Curated annotation (Swiss-Prot):
It is found in: Plastid, Chloroplast thylakoid membrane. One of its GO terms (cellular component) is NADH dehydrogenase complex. This is NAD(P)H-quinone oxidoreductase subunit 3, chloroplastic. HAMAP family: NDH1_NuoA. It comes from the Eukaryota. NDH is composed of at least 16 different subunits, 5 of which are encoded in the nucleus. One of its GO terms (molecular function) is quinone binding. The gene is ndhC. Keywords: Chloroplast, Membrane, NAD, NADP, Plastid, Plastoquinone, Quinone, Thylakoid, Translocase, Transmembrane, Transmembrane helix, Transport. GO terms for biological process: photosynthesis, light reaction. It holds the Pfam family Oxidored_q4. InterPro entries: NAD(P)H_OxRDtase_bac/plastid, NADH_UbQ/plastoQ_OxRdtase_su3, NDAH_ubi_oxred_su3_sf.
Length: 120
């Protein structure tokens, strides 16, 4: 028999974690002073007066570096739990992790050959 009361703590946590941010936004909207003027509508950058347009076009090279960083960051997220439980999981999981790393190395070599890692 499926016992629904076992999930009461989950529903309570879900409701509380949903209500707290909603209340925070409501209270800040009610209590915050509303003052619109030229100073409030201008952009603020570390106390320095902004010069020029805020819209800048970035080179695609920055996106390639960001993409390679995200790939290897996700690799770390996947490999860390595996490394922590390496002695429990056995040889088959070691082979799977090795295949995973080899696929990422092939991707890194491909990006390197295409020039995605060259800054100049």
């Amino acid at each position: 028999m499926f016992l629904l009361y076992e999930y009461d703590i989950f529903w309570a946590f879900l409701i509380i974690s949903s209500v707290i941010p909603i209340l925070a936004f409501l209270f800040s909207g009610i209590l915050a002073p509303i003052s619109k003027g030229p100073e409030k509508l201008s952009s603020y950058e570390s106390g320095i007066e902004p010069m020029g347009d805020a819209w800048l076009q970035f080179r695609i090279r920055y996106y390639m570096f960001a993409l390679v960083f995200v790939v290897f960051d996700v690799e770390t997220v996947f490999l860390y739990p595996w490394a922590m439980s390496f002695d429990i999981l056995g040889v088959s999981v070691f082979i799977e992790a090795l295949i995973f790393v080899l696929i990422l190395i092939v991707g890194l070599v491909y990006a390197w050959r295409k020039g995605a890692l060259e800054w100049s």
